[in-house]
Amino acid sequence: MFLSLIIPVYNVERYIDKTLKSILSQNAFPFTYEVIVVNDGTPDHSMEIVERYRYNFDNLTIINQENQGLSCARNSGLKIAKGDYVWFIDSDDSIPQDAFESLFPYLTRYRHEVLAFDITKIEEETGKKLTEKIFLKPKYYHLYNTSHNGTELNKKIHTGIVQRFIFCKSFLSRYHLTFTPGIIHEDIDFIVRILLHANSILPIAKPCYNYLLRSTGSIMSSLNIKSCTDRIKIIKLWNKIESEEHLSKMQTAVIEDNIFNICYGLLISSSGNVSSYEQFLRQNRNYIIRRGLTAALYSIFSYFSLGKVAKTSYLLINLLEK
């Protein structure tokens, strides 16, 4: 079996039909892929829709569990996945009609550890579509369709959406790569750890995923205090990796660069709940600034840019003002 698609389900009765239809109507033999739906204790009618599909498709499996959150649901699906590759799909998104046709040649002929591709962002209210390249800037487009080490792609590709990647399952198993339970920003944490270990990432110049921008917003659409505290947790998780694993200088640079980005982002963030945000800063400001400066000094030598120098100066000024 080439591919396992893992779909956590929670409160998506408006969307899950389109998601499953987009997958199960692909031009591919059923034995070449499986769909694993993880019912994360959804209280709505989503699973009634899923059950109708299971009746007609033998390659659809359902896992039922109490609500544990997105990371745990993905991990549950990963545990039973039979495919050589795994693709984490959100239950309000979809894939293009030719997605399998575009991706399967890479899954069957080559043994890349990770496939990365462009996505189409779709506004729910207007239906407006925008293609977002996997690369951050046009100057990196020449890197399409050639294999790269993960550390080479840091600062060159988008890392905030895990759905735009397909992973070799044996690669994930080898490095014990799973999602960290209970945190927001689990995708960033996961992808950074992917970049640390992957020796073969293939960027594909093709939009293979439809990412829905929901009009009701999402956890990520506004800053909240959990978002802030979870970013501190991620920094400490990465600190642990640095202390426990024998990382190369470039692997350490990947972590330090992303720690710097988190620290800088926390200081320039704004929040609807001003008092809670100010309390968070009072408790964590010195740690954020000092850790950010340490990360900046390390990563500047690896990824020098005037922008990073300017941001580092901002952190230093904040520290001196105390």
Where are these regions (language model features)?
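Glycine-rich, basic loop-to-helix element that forms the pyrophosphate-binding segment
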Residues: Q65-A81, S91, S102
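Short aromatic/hydrophobic "clamp" motif used to bind/position activated sugar donors
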Residues: V86
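Membrane-interface aromatic/basic loop that binds lipid-linked glycans or pyrophosphate carriers
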Residues: S271-K322
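Short, well-formed alpha-helical segments that are part of the catalytic scaffolds
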Residues: V12-Q26
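Donor-binding/catalytic cores of nucleotide-activated saccharide
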Residues: L70, S91-L202, Y211-L223
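A conserved acidic beta->alpha catalytic loop
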Residues: S22, N39-E48, E66
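Catalytic core of nucleotide-sugar-dependent glycosyltransferases
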Residues: K206-S215, S221-K249, I262-Y287
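Cell-envelope/extracellular polymer assembly enzymes that use nucleotide-activated donors
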Residues: F2-S4, E34, D189
